[in-house]
Amino acid sequence: MNTMEIRYHRLHQAMQERELDAVYVNAPENHLYMSHFDNPDGYLLISADESFVFADFRYTEAAKENVFPCCIVKEPGKPVLSELVAEKGWRRIGYEDESLTCAALAGLQKKMPEVEFVPTGDMFAQIRCAKTEDEIENIVAAQRIAEGAFQHILSVIRYDMTETEVAAELEYYMKKNGSEKPSFDTICVSGSNSSRPHGVPLPVQLEKGFLTMDYGAMVNGYHSDMTRTICIGKADEEMKKVYSTVLAAQQAAIEAARPGMRNAELDKVARDIIDAAGYGACFGHSLGHGVGPVSYTHRTLPTN
């Protein structure tokens, strides 16, 4: 089976387990994952033996060129959807409760009162967990672009640059070198702002001290997520201690990782080192997380 056939096989198995006649897919990452088509204002309807792409006039031409074999429905309005569901006789339809709004669900239920809409929870997240070889290649390609951006910024960064200029330089390099778009809003914070893990870049000159950059590239819909911290000016002893502690924790976790290990066990390997150095209260994040069609998958390395 090719990659798309594997995805549909997994989805059909999950649908069978939940006794679903069809699944209504509206989350952009899952729409792209199941169709090879980026359709931000449309949706998919997938049954055990058929798939339908609902796209308006802005996207139908692109859909014909890019979409995985599906029936393309040019009118995405609810009457067309309800007519199709009635024609097929579907009575249990799964929906993505993590992305479909309450208002949208209420609209579907009003148009199709005879249908039971069933929340799918993390069904798609579970399906996306196991990666095929070509998926891994896309993630690696995205990461290589991000790594190239880091090397690039080291070669061009200046004291008189602003946080927003550094962020823009990272994004420009990634776009120029094959990234479809940033994985998420690029973070670039310096000096006193560098303590904010998800701080917003400001049009202010770089401060001396730490400069933290958190960014990612996207290749064929697959994301990378990379964080790097450098020092503007000369690092003091405390900065060197922090750096050495984090590096030691990372290396210990990499060396300890093995198949079958519980996520919490691996997290503890790194966390114990950081705790022993006196920085335990500053380690609020989990040790790591997965990447794929989204930049932060539900597969994390938590403390429990």
Predicted regions and their residues:
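Active-site neighborhoods and metal-handling regions in enzymes and metal-associated proteins
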Residues: 1-299
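A short, hydrophobic C-terminal helix/tail in secreted or cell-surface proteins
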Residues: 300-304
